[in-house]
Amino acid sequence: MVSPLTRGLACVVALFSAAATAGAQNRRPMTFMDIMELKNVGGVSLSPNGSKVAYAVSGWEHPNARPSTDPAKPDTAKGDKHETRAHIWMVGAAGGTPRQLTFSERGENAPQWSPDGRSLAFLSSRGSGTEAKTQIWILPMDGGEAYQLTASKENVSGFEWSKDGSRIAFLAVDTLPKTDEAKTTRRDDPQVFEENFRLSHAWVIDVATKRATEVAHGNLTVSGAPSWSPDGTRLAFQAAPTTMLRDPRSDIYIVTIADKSLKKITTKPEAGSPPAWSPDGKTIAFTILPQSHIARPDSIMDREIGNDHLILYDVASGKARDTYDPKIDVSAGNPRWTSDGARVLFTTGERAWNAVYAYDVASNKLNRVVAKMLIGTPSLSKDGRLAAYTLGSSDAPADVYVSDLTFASPKKLTDINPQLRDIALGETEVITWKSTDGTPVEGVLLKPLGYQAGRKYPLLVEAHGGPTGATNAGFKANWGSPGQVWAGQGWAVLYPNPRGSTNYGEKFTRANIMDWGGGDYRDIMTGVDDVIKRGIADSSKMAFEGWSYGGYMTAWVVSQTSRFKAARMGAGLSDLQSMYGTTDIPGYIGTFFSGIPTQKTLDFYRARSAITFVDNVTTPLLIQQGGSDQRVPIGQSMEFFRALKDRGRTVQLVFYPREGHGLSEYYHQLDKMQREQAWITKYTLGAERVVP
């Protein structure tokens, strides 16, 4: 339910709305409840003939429970649990009214057309019983109810139709042996750390008979969807020896279905994407990180930092062509072949946006097709004339669009969040500045609602996670980054992309190796200075926050400067030495700090840990984290909290039960946003202001 404090201060929103500028007309500022009501679209699939688009719409649902934003009206079904669910929709590629195709309480996602366009496959756990597993379901498009195709004892994931539509390849997790099931039942179930992984293997099921056969078994776990050869005799897939996240020992394999023989086709580890078979069956496209970036490719202790290269593997000769162009300097995304096999398309992050690139097979050239679009991976029609995809903007979440393969004139097919027309939004601008060493740095600046030049505003700085990530110019309205709510309350929000971020070339991405808290910190602080110089930020009213690596940067910032009046550290790293020994991605940490902590490297681990400088911290700090986080174990938050608490500093630590590295439960997401907003406004502005 919405807290009494939230209800009691709901009038703040109304008062602020009345003071909004004429440009916003009668629209009101965004609230956290507005964020919780937003829908998201994904899983776009264009029918083979290009006439229809299937897609999944997800959002929070509960048939009997909705928190009330009206203080006079109580919550319905108080205490009931909210669930996030997706359902399959369809719309004509020429336009028209979208139609919902699925309605189950368990939800559905990942729609995929059969090659003849007569059926639509999707994933759902809509089977009977509370412990129903995710299975593949088939919806006949000429009428009738969807039926369950697979009957796996464990969850099914990535899948793909064979080219003739008679079979589907899919992934399923290994089942527990009966002896293990019995031990689990009686709670005789000790776990050996980093051993006995439950792997995912590739299966093939006959659509007509529903007979499923495992085709790739062994000490490999397959990820992503398998890719069929055009003649239906083989599958290509990506696999690694363990299920450990970011296991660098990932390769591409081909399995012959008839005899289940397996062939590894990569000679260097670190495959970055699932493979895609060319229409003529002669070539397989996938991405990989060059071995030069991996010091010990046979070890979990080394991990990639750099651009993924698009590789074309000739099936007959076994030769691989690296298509990377250092002059273009982008990281390749998941490859998609055009229907004629002449080009391979991929989307990639490029500065504060996305771009689509095409590799021309004949000319051996990589070219940008379109830039400065927040575009998702396109789904192509069989004749190669049309593409369907998601497309977002700074002012709205993504909707479904269709266009030709130039992507020049996208046509909008959906209106997923029409309620946004009643909400006034802050303006988004991409800005650049120079760091202390002259390095150009870019960031996204969200201006306060009703911004007036010459007026100074409170500034919130949000550091992104990663560090191999970037903040784009997209819509800032989700539990992790509710920037539009802050803008609606009169704040400017800066999202810097310091060195170490992706999207700005490989050299920039690798620039913070052995330098966490160094150049990246200076990049951020010079960005803050730039916003102050622009006359936008009030230097006496600034706050800082971030999650994951952004949480590390938050802890580091408050240990290095007292410029910020308040801060919020989300799932952040405070002690890099203990982080290395307890995280589920030790190799990723080790890559940035010259391998495992040793007598030689220990001083550096300590020198870049905020816990070392905890005596310097005076900024009031809110710490938030999932209680079951394995990526950044909760000890990182507890260490920093205890050190600050014992020194008499202003600090609060909040754990969210059952949550991992991110927050997935309704009331946890809502509390995270409201609590951080109350904390930051209290210590920055001197008064609590909680938005519903």
What is the predicted role of each segment?
Residues 84, 207, 462, 479-489, ...:
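Active-site-proximal cap/loop segments of hydrolase catalytic domains
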Residues 92-96, 140-144, 206-210, 256-260, ...:
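Short loop/turn segments that connect beta-strands within beta-propeller blades
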Residues 45, 56-57, 61-65, 169-171, ...:
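Non-catalytic accessory segments flanking enzyme active sites
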Residues 53, 117-121, 168, 232-235, ...:
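Hydrophobic beta-strand positions that form the internal "hydrophobic ladder"
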Residues 48-49, 115-116, 163-164, 230-231, ...:
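Residue-level detector of Asp-centered blade-edge/turn motifs that repeat once per structural unit
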